[in-house]
Amino acid sequence: MKPQKSLRARAMDILSRQEVSRIGLKRKLAPHAESEEELENVLNEFAERNWQSDLRYAEAYIRSKSRKHGSLRLKQALAQQGIDEETSRNLLPDRSSEKQAAIDVLRKKFKHPAADLKEKQKQARFLAYRGFDADTVQTALKHAWDENWEDGC
């Protein structure tokens, strides 16, 4: 039988594999903590030593998801992980790169422009589900298959 890992060792193990928000780390460690105080002490120590950083987590999350998802969805996901709105707003991609991401996602999913209103609505719903705002969705639908579309034109 293996000896039980300490809470500190479990936290180090989790953080060695991926960036995790404070709330995410707390959720993963809570079942193994003997008390809330012990858990908070470990979380505070890791934050003080900069082994766990919500800012690094937010940067990594946005870097990995921003090519497929819009700012609304990214903001909501970060808020669920306890990242404040100001931090997430500062890290989100600018409008032109978000519009380009919407166009790229649309082109990948749908190989041709919408033939009728029903298909156009389907494409719009798809982008909205991905977290793109209404203005970005309209721009993407309008310019996705333009040959001369450049970022932000």
Swiss-Prot record:
Top-level taxon of origin: Bacteria
Keywords, alphabetical: Cytoplasm
Pfam families: RecX_HTH2, RecX_HTH3
Location in or out of the cell: Cytoplasm
A cellular-component GO term for this protein: cytoplasm
InterPro entries named among the record's database cross-references: RecX_HTH_2nd, RecX_HTH_3rd, Regulatory_RecX, WH-like_DNA-bd_sf
Gene Ontology process terms (BP): regulation of DNA repair
Chief subcellular location: cytoplasm
Entry's family note: Belongs to the RecX family.
Protein purpose: Modulates RecA activity.
Protein name (record): Regulatory protein RecX
Species for this entry: Neisseria meningitidis serogroup C / serotype 2a (strain ATCC 700532 / DSM 15464 / FAM18)
NCBIfam families: PRK00117.2-5
